[in-house]
A protein has these predicted regions:
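Residue-level recognition of single "structural anchor" positions
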Residues: 1-308
Length: 308
């Protein structure tokens, strides 16, 4: 069942912290300082912060946000949960401007940084290998547009960024921002993510010809001759192209422009939604919440990436 937006966890701070702690600590509070499980008292009082505990063993104080992307945040927990749910429930994504208006933050920058921290939580700890014996992995590349303000005066189109997507027809998808479509560049990513026991399906790009020999089988379709399927529909890259269609709708319909520096996190979000497409919005939001452990993202990191 999907989460009801009228649920108390989205408007009551105590309920929000209780939900967050139940996901973060299913077996009771864990002290991040000494590692002791379920041996802490909750500090209660008018001046006490929400979710504050004191460990019986090391006597240090802690909250469930330590060691997560929420650490150090002054944003109320119920707004974090609501923002994460809205991003997980929106098929084409949620822009920072929209989130800013809906949640009533003091600044757009706060909402923008919040979105990136939530995307960081969606990042898988391990990528691949996808595919395997008797499975088909599609590999295809596309161009995602940059910002119009960054284009040269004489150019009609903004700079495009190359994205490679690998998708197991019966499983997950992973997308990457790559420098070019040369054989060496493609190989560096594909052989790490896709099992070589897989059948590799691609388009007719010459860079795939040699690479295909490293897999159990390789077939391609030539779009320049209006060929989109072969071998009775077995060879195609339609699944990967479906992924690209969803990506571009998110760019044009929601975000309008995405900078090269932050593109990888948007790719993570789109892959996450594809890989959890059979889940309800509530289940997807819970998975995103579970993924925040052991991850940190500071505003300085995002700002430095934008100016790198």
């Amino acid at each position: 069942m999907s989460i009801d937006l009228t649920d108390k966890i989205f408007n009551d701070e105590d309920a929000a912290w209780k939900h967050f702690e139940s996901v973060r600590w299913p077996d009771g509070p864990i002290c991040p300082h000494c590692g002791v499980i379920d041996s802490a008292d909750k500090i209660i009082g008018k001046t006490a912060r929400h979710g504050l505990y004191r460990c019986h063993e090391c006597v240090k104080q802690f909250t469930a946000t330590i060691g997560t992307i929420y650490e150090g945040s002054h944003i109320p927990m119920h707004k974090w949960l609501l923002a994460a749910h809205l991003m997980c429930a929106s098929k084409k994504g949620m822009s920072a401007h929209q989130l800013w208006r809906m949640l009533g933050f003091g600044s757009y920058r706060t909402a923008w940084f919040m979105c990136h921290r939530i995307r960081e939580g969606m990042t898988p700890k391990n990528v691949g290998p996808i595919g395997g014996q008797n499975r088909v992995v599609e590999a295809d590349e596309t161009l995602i547009g940059g910002k119009k303000k960054n284009r040269a005066f004489a150019k009609k189109e903004p700079k495009k960024h190359t994205v490679l997507t690998l998708v197991d027809r019966d499983g997950d998808s992973h997308s990457f921002h790559i420098a070019n479509v040369k054989a060496k560049t493609l190989r560096e990513t594909i052989v790490k993510v896709a099992s070589r026991k897989s059948y590799l399906a691609t388009d007719a790009l010459a860079s795939y010809e040699t690479l295909g020999r490293e897999f159990a089988g390789h077939g391609s379709v030539d779009h320049s001759t209006d060929e989109y399927v072969r071998l009775g529909g077995f060879v195609h890259v339609n699944t990967a192209e479906c992924r690209f269609s969803l990506m571009k709708r998110a760019v044009f319909g929601t975000h309008h422009s995405i900078s090269e520096a932050h593109l990888p996190r948007y790719l993570v979000e789109w892959d996450f939604k594809w890989n959890t497409r059979k889940m309800t919005d509530g289940e997807r939001a819970t998975i995103a919440l579970e993924g925040i452990e052991g991850k940190r993202l500071t505003y300085r990191q995002t700002n430095e990436a934008a100016h790198a």
